[in-house]
């Protein structure tokens, strides 16, 4: 039995076919190592209800992910030709016309199974994995099939991961957004932050 991918560990590699800008090509996860962060964005299947709302918003905000040197790979158990048909359909029909990142085919369900997001019905749970430039898993979530994911939260998490990796010794507190106060990750030093945050405020 495959172990569930763990934070701080190398994710299962894969080589498969993807579709980008209506062209089919090979996609290998390890090719991004040393170059970019990668978001693996699993979704149940093409032409479902929730998936296009997530996938199109990711596409509309692709510039924000590119600024963070991040590649999005959307993965489902559909064939490359199903992906191509999905990309040929316009938004009004629930399609993904002009999508700004690849759709990855996992027709054999190998990738979905390796990442432990395969449903009993043979679809993919809405799983999400953030992999850093060193090829290490830094974050993952798995959602209810009928609950859409929050792209603002995804960007916030991505920025916080990059911040703490680039600034050793610091941590990002609750609801942190880029530019907000950070504090020391050491338990003793972090008390400086707690004192400032929770001490009674003096009235003027």
From Swiss-Prot:
Pfam family, one: AhpC-TSA
InterPro entries named among the record's database cross-references: AhpC/TSA, Peroxiredoxin, Peroxiredoxin_AhpC-typ, Thioredoxin-like_sf, Thioredoxin_domain
Keywords from the named record: Antioxidant, Chloroplast, Oxidoreductase, Peroxidase, Plastid, Redox-active center
Main localization of the protein described in the UniProt heading: plastid
Enzymatic class: oxidoreductase
Cellular compartments annotated: Plastid, Chloroplast
Record-level GO cellular component terms: chloroplast; cytosol
EC number assigned by the record: 1.11.1.-
Catalyzed reactions: a hydroperoxide + [protein]-dithiol = [protein]-disulfide + an alcohol + H2O
GO biological process annotation, one example: response to oxidative stress
Keyword hit for Cell membrane: no
SUPFAM superfamilies in the cross-refs: Thioredoxin-like
Disulfide bonds: none
Span of domain Thioredoxin: 5-163
GO molecular function, one term: thioredoxin peroxidase activity
Superkingdom of the organism of origin: Eukaryota
Family, similarity comment: Belongs to the peroxiredoxin family. AhpC/Prx1 subfamily.
Additional remark text: The active site is a conserved redox-active cysteine residue, the peroxidatic cysteine (C(P)), which makes the nucleophilic attack on the peroxide substrate. The peroxide oxidizes the C(P)-SH to cysteine sulfenic acid (C(P)-SOH), which then reacts with another cysteine residue, the resolving cysteine (C(R)), to form a disulfide bridge. The disulfide is subsequently reduced by an appropriate electron donor to complete the catalytic cycle. In this typical 2-Cys peroxiredoxin, C(R) is provided by the other dimeric subunit to form an intersubunit disulfide.
Name of the protein described by the UniProt record: Putative peroxiredoxin ycf42
Name of the gene: ycf42
